[in-house]
């Protein structure tokens, strides 16, 4: 569940915070009436967070443990600014204002053609920073449609829309032409699904096809879940502070593997 409102239409900080309090209360009441478990509520700053920088309105409000800070990290994608450590450090500082809630960048990305430019490392750098600062992420979209409002002016300007997403789309027929394998290849990688204790580090070495993650403050007997983007053999896993690696589920060409903690500190390495 995502809730957001733009300060540029008149909300000041206190009003924005009050909005999120009301939104969270309404969501939790709906869940109670539906006999549903509490879902994660994503809350955002202004969609002009990139442009406004430190002047952005960052909501700070009373919440439960099921909230996630979700700014759109579009620097060097579609917005000005530099995509660097300072951006992600700022994100963590803003999350700390709400008690250190987890962070998920609700949107990020850029034109898919940049993924095939050998001189352009935008996608690799963004994912590297996500790992370094342990930020989850969702890209803008899976497949764009010709009728997307973002392209409303294109017919009048006589330009073909530059469609985002994993699929080439013909406009105006809106027919899928094909899958962008080169684009997908830059984004195809392992992802931690559940980590015991606290995640200490994540590193996806895409050049050498090696994934490493470590954690601390775990309790013995806790389960780690790791999604792998291709089939592996158990011999490709190196575990420290973990035991009993097992294939939990196959998802298309990918797999979810588990392991059980034996110590407070753990490390998992996968070589492809």
Task: For the regions a language model picked out, list residue spans one by one.
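Short, solvent-exposed turn/loop segments enriched in Gly/Ser/Thr/Pro and often Arg
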Residues: 1, 45-48, 140-147
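Extracellular glycoside hydrolase catalytic/binding regions
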Residues: 2-135
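Aromatic-rich peripheral "rim/lid" segments of glycoside hydrolase catalytic domains that contact
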Residues: 58-63, 70, 115-241, 249-272
């Amino acid at each position: 569940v995502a809730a957001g409102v733009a300060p540029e239409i008149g909300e000041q900080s206190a009003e924005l915070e009050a909005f999120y309090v009301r939104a969270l209360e309404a969501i939790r009441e709906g869940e109670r009436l539906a006999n549903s478990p509490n879902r994660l509520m994503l809350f955002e700053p202004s969609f002009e967070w990139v442009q406004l920088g430190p002047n952005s309105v960052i909501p700070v409000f009373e919440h439960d443990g099921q909230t996630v800070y979700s700014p759109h990290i579009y620097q060097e994608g579609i917005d000005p600014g530099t995509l660097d450590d300072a951006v992600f450090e700022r994100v963590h500082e803003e999350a700390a204002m709400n008690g250190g809630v987890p962070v998920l960048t609700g949107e990020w990305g850029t034109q898919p053609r940049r993924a095939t430019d050998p001189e352009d490392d935008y996608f690799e750098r963004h994912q590297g920073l996500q790992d370094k600062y342990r930020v989850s992420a969702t890209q803008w979209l899976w497949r764009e449609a010709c009728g997307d409002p973002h392209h409303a002016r294109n017919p009048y300007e006589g330009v073909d829309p530059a469609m985002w997403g994993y699929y080439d789309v013909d406009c105006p027929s809106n027919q899928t032409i094909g899958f962008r394998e080169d684009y997908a290849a830059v984004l195809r990688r392992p992802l931690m699904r559940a980590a015991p204790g606290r995640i200490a580090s994540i590193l996806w070495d895409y050049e050498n096809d090696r994934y490493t993650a470590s954690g601390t403050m775990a309790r013995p007997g806790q389960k780690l879940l790791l999604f792998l983007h291709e089939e592996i053999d158990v011999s490709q896993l190196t575990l420290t502070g973990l035991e009993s690696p097992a294939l939990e589920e196959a998802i298309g060409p990918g797999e979810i593997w588990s392991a059980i903690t034996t110590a407070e500190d753990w490390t998992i390495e996968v070589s492809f």
